[in-house]
């Protein structure tokens, strides 16, 4: 499971350097990949402006986020009208084309993500450690049954297991976890200055790689 205490403290103390004030450059560049889709899944969504951008594009946005602070900030900062509901042991907020579940992503059922055909993942793969990423890949396969496309801007600084969160996600790992069911393509790769904390852990490079996952016909 993600380190909920770590992330909760970050939100509580407003230590959210990972939060962006505008949509991600790769989402802007590749938004038309979603033109034939209607409903998109945004895991560990925080209060990301990416969701506003996706909604303005015409997509119904289904998010999941464990931090109530993040969800309430998202609603307030964007002047949204969303109503709080409860189903099973899950809380969710719905309205204005958004539905955001509050809680553990792995407690969602297939019915909660019915109709979702695409996913924008800027936050979850890099938040999960290696074993959690295995569980997450299985979750997408088992729960998001109609998923055919994923756009994922990820971080890559090699196989440095204890450097995170955010964690490194390599091409080798993605092929092991998703290669059977998805065609994987690098859409862009941006080198970034190697941070000292990563260098001290053995990393020799740091980059942001935007991946496209397209479901194989027989995948």
Where do the model's predicted regions map?
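Class I (Rossmann-like) S-adenosyl-L-methionine-dependent methyltransferase catalytic domain
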Residues: 1-38, 47-51, 63-98, 102-112, ...
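A short, conserved alpha-helix within the catalytic core of class I
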Residues: 127-139
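A conserved beta-strand element that flanks and buttresses the S-adenosyl-L-methionine
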Residues: 120
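Conserved acetyl-CoA-binding loop of GNAT-fold acetyltransferases
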Residues: 59
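Gly/Ala-rich phosphate-binding loop of Rossmann-like dinucleotide-binding domains
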Residues: 55-56
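Local beta-strand N-terminus motif with an aromatic residue
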Residues: 37, 115-116, 124
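Short amphipathic alpha-helical interaction patches enriched in hydrophobic/aromatic residues
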Residues: 15, 123-124
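Class I SAM-dependent methyltransferase "Motif I" SAM/SAH-binding loop
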Residues: 41-46, 124
């Amino acid at each position: 499971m993600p380190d909920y205490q770590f992330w909760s403290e970050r939100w509580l103390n407003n230590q959210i350097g990972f939060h962006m004030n505008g949509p991600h450059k790769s989402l802007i560049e590749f938004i038309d990949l979603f033109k034939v889709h209607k409903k998109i899944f945004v895991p560990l969504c925080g209060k990301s402006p990416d969701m506003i951008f996706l909604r303005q594009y015409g997509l119904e946005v289904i998010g999941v986020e464990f931090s109530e602070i993040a969800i309430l900030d998202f609603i307030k900062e964007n002047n949204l009208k969303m109503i709080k509901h409860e189903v099973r042991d899950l809380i969710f907020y719905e309205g204005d084309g958004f539905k955001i579940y509050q809680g553990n992503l792995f407690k969602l059922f297939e019915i909660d993500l019915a109709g979702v055909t695409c996913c924008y993942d800027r936050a979850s793969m890099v938040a999960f450690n290696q074993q959690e990423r295995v569980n997450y890949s299985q979750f997408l396969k088992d729960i998001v049954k109609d998923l055919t496309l994923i756009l994922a801007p990820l971080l890559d600084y090699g196989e440095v297991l204890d450097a995170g969160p955010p964690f490194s996600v390599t091409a080798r790992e993605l092929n092991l976890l998703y290669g059977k069911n998805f065609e994987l393509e690098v859409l862009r790769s941006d080198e970034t200055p190697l941070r000292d904390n990563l260098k001290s852990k053995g990393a020799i490079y740091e980059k942001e790689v935007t991946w496209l996952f397209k479901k194989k016909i027989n995948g």
